[in-house]
Design a protein with these regions (language model features):
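Membrane-proximal helix-turn-helix segments that form the acceptor-binding/catalytic region
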Residues: 155, 168, 184-224, 238-241
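Carbohydrate-associated surface elements
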Residues: 229, 251
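Conserved donor-binding/catalytic core segment of Leloir-type glycosyltransferases
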Residues: 272-291, 297-300
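Nucleotide-activated donor-binding/catalytic signature segment of Leloir-type glycosyltransferases, i.e.
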Residues: 310, 317-342, 350
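Aromatic "clamp/platform" in nucleotide-sugar-dependent glycosyltransferases that forms part
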Residues: 356
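Short hydrophobic beta-strand element within catalytic cores of glycosyltransferases
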Residues: 373-376, 386
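Conserved acidic donor-binding segment of nucleotide-sugar-dependent glycosyltransferases
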Residues: 388-389, 393-400, 409-415
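A short, well-ordered alpha-helix in the C-terminal region of glycosyltransferases
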Residues: 402, 409, 416-431, 437-443, ...
Length: 456
C-alpha cells in the first residue's frame, strides 16, 4: 500500500547554473550529509560495461556523493563488480520458452527488419522482489527484452526511477523509431519495422497496450531522459500519462577522458605519420543504419576528390567487413581499457560521428572531454552535446555535402579547431562531468524517496 506525501524539494532541471558551479555542488553535499535519508540505490540493468551509462552513473555516485551507496544489479554480471538479479525458480524454466517464442516471432514476421532491434518483453525474467527492496530507491536502466518482466515491477515496494536510454519504453518494442510516429497512437497500424502480414498487424498495438498496463500499475515511477530531445519524444507518447519526466544527462568521467600529455607519442605508437590530420570514427557502426556508418567512406572519398591527401583514418571497434578507404587507416580494434580509449581520442584531430538517431551520443561526450571536436548530424539529442560552432560542427541530418564541408573547414582552420577543442572541454566539465550529474541524480533520489513511503 502506498501513501503519498508532499514532495520535499524540487527536481534539479538541466541548465541550472547553480549545478554547473562548485558552490551549488557543495550546497547539495552539505545538505545531504546533514540529513541523510536515501542511502542505498540499486542500478538495475541487463549487463553493463565500463563505457555504459549505468556503470558510469554508479561510479560517479559512489565517488562524489558521501553517505550514498550505489550498487549494480545485473542479469549478467560478467567482469563488472555488482550483484546478479535473483531469479525466481519457477521462472528459470521459462528460458527455453522465451527462446522458442523469439524464434516463432521471426517465423511469423519474415519481413521484419533484422538490422533494427525490436524487443518483445513477453515472458520476461521473474525476479525476487525482496532483493530489490533492500534498496531505498531502485533505478532501472536497460531492462527490455528478457531482463525483467514489466508486469512484476508493480510488486516492488520501493520508489522506481527509470532512465530511458532509447525509445523502447514508449513503443511496442522498437528501440529506434527512425522517424516513425505510430508510437503517438499506441503503435496502431502497419509497423514499418515488423512488416507484418495483415493477419498479424495488431501485434504492435497489443504489445504497446500490455506494456502500458504494466507501467500504469507501478505506484511510484519517475522517468529520466538523458536528453531534452528524448524527453519531448516521451511526452508525445501515451505510454506514461501523468508521470513525472526529468531530464538529466549521462555522465562522462572528465578525470579519465582528458587530453593526453603527449599526443605525438600515442600517434607514433599507432604508426600514424607526423603531421597527418587524423580523423577518428567508430568501425562497429559502419553497417548499422542507425549509426550512419555508410557515410564515413563517402565523406572520405569526397575529401580525397577535393585534393586532401595528408589524412589518416583512426578506427575504433570491430569492423565487420572490409572497406577500402582512400587514405591510410589504423584500426585499434575493440577497446575495453578506458584509459587507452581516452588516448585514442586524444590522438585524433576530429571525431566523425554520422549517427542518424541517438539519444545523446556517449562518443561525442568522450571525444569532447579529450579536446577532440566532433563533426556530426543534427539528430536526436546529439546537438545538446555537440554545440554547433562552439564545441563541434553539426550538419543537417543526411547532408553529405555539408558534413564534408565541415570536415574540410576544420582541416584548413587550425585556429577554429583549437577554439572548439577548448570550449568542448569546458562544456564537458560544466555539463556532463561526474560531480555535476551525480549531484542531480542524488537530488532526484532524495526527492523521490521522501515523496513516497511504503507501509508494510
Amino acid at each position: 500500500m502506498v501513501r503519498q506525501i508532499a514532495p520535499s524539494g524540487n527536481v534539479v532541471q538541466p541548465g541550472c547554473s547553480e549545478w554547473g558551479s562548485f558552490t551549488g555542488f557543495l550546497i547539495l553535499i552539505l545538505s545531504y550529509v546533514a540529513s541523510p535519508q536515501c542511502r542505498t540505490i540499486f542500478q538495475v540493468s541487463h549487463s553493463v560495461s565500463a563505457s555504459s551509462a549505468p556503470y558510469r552513473l554508479s561510479d560517479a555516485l559512489n565517488r562524489h556523493i558521501p553517505g550514498l551507496k550505489s550498487t549494480l544489479l545485473l542479469r549478467r554480471r560478467k567482469e563488472i563488480d555488482g550483484l546478479e538479479i535473483h531469479r525466481t525458480p519457477a521462472r528459470r524454466a521459462t528460458d527455453a520458452l522465451r527462446r522458442h517464442l523469439a524464434h516463432g516471432f521471426d517465423i511469423l514476421l519474415p519481413e521484419r527488419r533484422k538490422d533494427l532491434p525490436f524487443s518483445l518483453n513477453v515472458l520476461g525474467m521473474g525476479f525476487d522482489t525482496a532483493q530489490m527492496e533492500k534498496a531505498d530507491v531502485v533505478h532501472l536502466h536497460w531492462i527490455g527484452g528478457r531482463t525483467v518482466d514489466f508486469s512484476q515491477l508493480c510488486h516492488i515496494r520501493r520508489p522506481l526511477v527509470y532512465t530511458l536510454h532509447d525509445m523502447f519504453a514508449c513503443t511496442a518494442g522498437c528501440h529506434c523509431t527512425m522517424d516513425c510516429g505510430l508510437f503517438q497512437d499506441e503503435c496502431r497500424g502497419n509497423c514499418p519495422q515488423l512488416g507484418a502480414p495483415r493477419l498479424f498487424r495488431n501485434i504492435p498495438a497489443w504489445l504497446f497496450s500490455r506494456k502500458r498496463r504494466a507501467f500504469g500499475r507501478i505506484p511510484s515511477l519517475t522517468l529520466v531522459t538523458p536528453s531534452l530531445w528524448l524527453k519531448r519524444e516521451v511526452e508525445r507518447s501515451c505510454m506514461f500519462p501523468g508521470r513525472k519526466i526529468v531530464q538529466i544527462y549521462n555522465p562522462v568521467d572528465t578525470d579519465l577522458f582528458r587530453p593526453a600529455e603527449d599526443r605525438n607519442a600515442i600517434r607514433a605508437g599507432l604508426g600514424i605519420p607526423p603531421g597527418a590530420f587524423v580523423i577518428a570514427c567508430g568501425a562497429t557502426g559502419l553497417f548499422n543504419p542507425v549509426k550512419g556508418g555508410h557515410f564515413i567512406p563517402l565523406v572520405l572519398e569526397e575529401l580525397y576528390r577535393r585534393g586532401h591527401r595528408n589524412l589518416h583514418l583512426l578506427l575504433f571497434g570491430n569492423q565487420e567487413k572490409s572497406v577500402d578507404y582512400p587514405f591510410p587507416s589504423t584500426n585499434a580494434g575493440f577497446i575495453t581499457d578506458m584509459n587507452k580509449l581516452a588516448g585514442l581520442y586524444s590522438a585524433a584531430d576530429i571525431f566523425l560521428n554520422p549517427t542518424l538517431q541517438d539519444v545523446l551520443s556517449n562518443v561525442a561526450l568522450e571525444s569532447m572531454a579529450c579536446k577532440t571536436p566532433s563533426v556530426t548530424f543534427r539528430t536526436g539529442g546529439v546537438p545538446e552535446a555537440v554545440l554547433d560552432g562552439r564545441t563541434g560542427l553539426v550538419a543537417q541530418q543526411g547532408d553529405l555535402n555539408q558534413m564534408v564541408a565541415h570536415c574540410e573547414r576544420l582541416i584548413q582552420d587550425g585556429k577554429l579547431l583549437q577554439t572548439l577543442a577548448e570550449e568542448g572541454r569546458r562544456h564537458a566539465e560544466q555539463t556532463f562531468s561526474y560531480p555535476v550529474i551525480a549531484a542531480r541524480h542524488a537530488a532526484l533520489y532524495e526527492e523521490t524517496f521522501r515523496e513516497y513511503r511504503y507501509e508494510e
